[in-house]
UniProtKB/Swiss-Prot annotation:
Residues binding NAD(+), per UniProt: 12-13, 34, 78, 121, 316
Record flagged with keyword Cytoplasm: yes
Location relative to the cell: Cytoplasm
Protein name: Glyceraldehyde-3-phosphate dehydrogenase
Organism of provenance: Streptococcus dysgalactiae subsp. equisimilis
Cysteine pairings via disulfide bonds: none
EC category name: oxidoreductase
Amino acid sequence: MVVKVGINGFGRIGRLAFRRIQNVEGVEVTRINDLTDPNMLAHLLKYDTTQGRFDGTVEVKEGGFEVNGNFIKVSAERDPENIDWATDGVEIVLEATGFFAKKEAAEKPLHANGAKKVVITAPGGNDVKQLFSTLTTSILDGTETVISGASCTTNCLAPMAKALHDAFGIQKGLMTTIHAYTGDQMIVDGHRGGGDLRRARAGAANIVPNSTGARKAIGLVIPELNGKLDGAAQRVPVPTGSVTELVVTLDKNVSVDEINAAMKAASNDSFGYTEDPIVSSDIVGVSYGSLFDATQTKVMEVDGSQLVKVVSWYDNEMSYTAQLVRTLEYFAKIAK
């Protein structure tokens, strides 16, 4: 049985999700909705500065485009309630516009023309279950109509924090994500809505201090860590490829080897482990939501207790997208 998917919003995440889905058996994209001209969408699908060329054929046709010989209808509806998902058999909508990230707004397609489920490609509200790895799919029972893939940074931080907490118990911690610049930053200094003076500065020429939603989201995806972690972001001049540092105090004293062993034992298809001396360009295109770097683990003795630092890499584009597609695939299997 093939599960048919619609993508609402064909930006960075929407396009990369489309690429990933091409290799998922039993899942097929039959409708894309985006306000951009289909010629532009097809071109941006085919050519990608950071992720490389699409491994397939893309040809613009009337009403959409043909990918690897399969026609995908493209619409340009501003309101999701006006999208005729049923005509193309869409069962699950990947909500990737960024404008409908709350449950009430994300549910619009469910009340219009046949869609049954929605996966939000952004942190949802407190009333939406958020998943960060294949391990957390157990929180779903199949009756959910809307779920969230959380954020790229949460998908990096959470499995590392969970593995550390499960093994040794986290008391308190501070995280910093050193994050690639993104499309909501300026290329050159200029006026920007929202009043964020730092984001008004050139993203590819500056280290830009910023906030991160992961500091709050961690308590939603791992309730036992609620209120225990805080943090911030530093946007840096690379197009993709990011890293999260977590400094914590633990319930017990540990060694570097013990920490790395616990992380290696916790590794899976969502949470990778490496002992190679990698740099940010080495993780572009990686499918792990979080890739733990054992070479950067540090333990510092402080008056009989310890400060522990752990580090995990992520491609803030593809790592997150790979997680979303895994979530979507599982969601499709258990849908009731």
